Amino acid sequence: MTRDGDNSELNQIKSKIQEHLVSSGNYELISKQLKLQLIESGWYDKVAQIAMDELNNSSSKDTKDGGRAYTTKSLSDLYTVVKPKAEGLVPNEVRENMLKRIELYLDDLIE
C-alpha cells in the first residue's frame, strides 16, 4: 500500500474511533477529566500568564492617538506563540493519566 493509502486508512480509523468516543459519551468524560486535572495543576493560570506576558511584551511603542502598537496583532499570532509553550507545560502526570485512560478505552473497544 502507498504512503497516501496508509494515511487515508489511518485517518478513517481515527475518524471511527473519534465518532465512537463521542457517541459513547467517553469523549466528554475524558475531556472533563483533562480539564479538571489541568485546573488542579495550575496549568490554566500559567498559560494565561504566558498570554498576558506576550501581550504586554509585544507592545512596541505608543501610537499618535495615545494607544499602543502591538507586534501580536491577532488572536492567531498570540495562539502561534502560546500554543507550544502551553503544550510543554502540561504536567507529565496529566499526560500519563490521559494516555492510560485512552488506552483503556481502546482496549475495551477492541475486545
Swiss-Prot record:
GO CC entries = DUBm complex; nuclear pore; nucleoplasm; P-body; SAGA complex; transcription export complex 2
Source domain of life is Eukaryota
InterPro entries from the UniProt entry: TF_ENY2 (IPR018783), TF_EnY2_sf (IPR038212)
Q: Which HAMAP family match?
A: ENY2_Sus1
Tell me the protein's name.
Answer: Transcription and mRNA export factor SUS1
Gene that this polypeptide is encoded by: SUS1
Q: Assembly state and interactors? A: Component of the nuclear pore complex (NPC)-associated TREX-2 complex (transcription and export complex 2), composed of at least SUS1, SAC3, THP1, SEM1, and CDC31. TREX-2 contains 2 SUS1 chains. The TREX-2 complex interacts with the nucleoporin NUP1. Component of the 1.8 MDa SAGA transcription coactivator-HAT complex. SAGA is built of 5 distinct domains with specialized functions. Within the SAGA complex, SUS1, SGF11, SGF73 and UBP8 form an additional subcomplex of SAGA called the DUB module (deubiquitination module). Interacts directly with THP1, SAC3, SGF11, and with the RNA polymerase II.
Q: To which protein family does this belong?
A: Belongs to the ENY2 family.
* Cellular compartment(s): Nucleus, Nucleoplasm; Cytoplasm, P-body
| GO terms for MF | transcription coactivator activity
Function recorded in the entry: Involved in mRNA export coupled transcription activation by association with both the TREX-2 and the SAGA complexes. At the promoters, SAGA is required for recruitment of the basal transcription machinery. It influences RNA polymerase II transcriptional activity through different activities such as TBP interaction and promoter selectivity, interaction with transcription activators, and chromatin modification through histone acetylation and deubiquitination.
- Per the record, the major location class is nucleus
Alphabetized, the UniProt keywords read: Activator, Chromatin regulator, Cytoplasm, mRNA transport, Nucleus, Protein transport, Transcription, Transcription regulation, Translocation, Transport
The Gene Ontology biological process terms listed for this entry are:
chromatin organization; mRNA export from nucleus; protein transport; transcription elongation by RNA polymerase II
Q: Which organism is it from?
A: Lodderomyces elongisporus (strain ATCC 11503 / CBS 2605 / JCM 1781 / NBRC 1676 / NRRL YB-4239)
- Keyword Transcription in annotation: yes
